[in-house]
C-alpha cells in the first residue's frame, strides 16, 4: 500500500503566503496536485506567491497529474453535489481513485464543503492548521500560534473555535 498525499490549492497558497511551503515535502515527500489545482495556483499570476509556487512546480516533490476527460465529467457532478470548485472536485476524485486502488490516501484541503465531501467519500483529510500541528509534532516548527496569526494577517479566515482547538492540540495558549 502506497502513501499518497494530494493537495488542493488553499493549503498550498496558505503555506506559501507564510513562507512555510517547504513543510509539505518535509512532512510527506511527494505531493500530488491535479492540473486543475495547479491552474488555480498560477493562472493569471493572481497570487503574490506565484514565483514561489512556480519554483515548487519545478521541484521534484510536487507532481502534477492530468485530469482525464472522464474525471472532468465526474468533477462537474461533484461540483453540483457538494457545492465545491473544480479544483477541489478534481483533487477529491484523484484521491478516491487512489483509495479504490488500496493506497493510503491523505487529502489536504481547507474548504469546509470540500472536507465534508472528503468525509462523505471516507477519505482522510487534513487542513493547513492540521499540517502546522503535524509540523510542530515533528519538530519542524517551534510554535503554531505565530503561523496562525500570520495566516490571519494574510486574510486567511480561521474561526475563533478553530484557533482555540488548534492551539489546544498544539499545547499552546
Task: Set out the residue ranges of the language-model regions.
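Short, low-complexity, intrinsically disordered N-terminal peptides in bacterial proteins
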Residues: 1-2, 173
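Acidic, PIN/NYN-like endoribonuclease modules and their adjacent C-terminal/linker elements
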Residues: 104, 115-173
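Active-site-proximal, substrate-binding regions of enzyme catalytic domains
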Residues: 3-106, 112, 120-123, 146, ...
Amino acid at each position: 500500500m502506497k502513501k499518497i498525499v494530494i493537495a488542493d490549492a488553499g493549503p498550498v497558497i496558505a503555506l506559501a503566503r507564510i513562507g512555510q511551503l517547504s513543510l509539505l515535502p518535509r512532512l510527506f515527500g511527494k505531493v500530488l496536485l491535479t492540473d486543475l489545482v495547479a491552474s488555480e495556483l498560477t493562472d493569471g499570476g493572481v497570487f503574490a506567491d506565484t514565483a514561489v509556487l512556480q519554483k515548487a512546480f519545478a521541484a521534484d516533490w510536487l507532481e502534477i497529474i492530468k485530469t482525464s476527460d472522464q474525471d472532468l465529467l465526474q468533477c462537474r457532478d461533484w461540483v453540483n453535489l457538494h457545492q465545491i470548485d473544480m479544483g477541489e472536485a478534481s483533487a477529491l476524485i484523484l484521491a478516491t481513485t487512489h483509495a479504490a486502488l488500496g493506497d493510503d490516501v491523505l487529502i489536504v484541503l481547507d474548504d469546509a464543503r470540500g472536507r465534508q465531501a472528503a468525509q462523505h467519500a471516507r477519505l482522510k483529510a487534513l487542513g493547513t492548521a492540521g499540517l502546522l500541528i503535524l509540523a510542530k509534532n515533528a519538530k519542524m516548527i517551534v510554535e503554531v500560534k505565530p503561523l496562525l496569526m500570520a495566516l490571519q494577517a494574510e486574510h486567511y479566515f480561521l474561526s475563533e473555535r478553530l484557533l482555540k482547538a488548534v492551539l489546544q492540540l498544539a499545547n499552546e495558549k
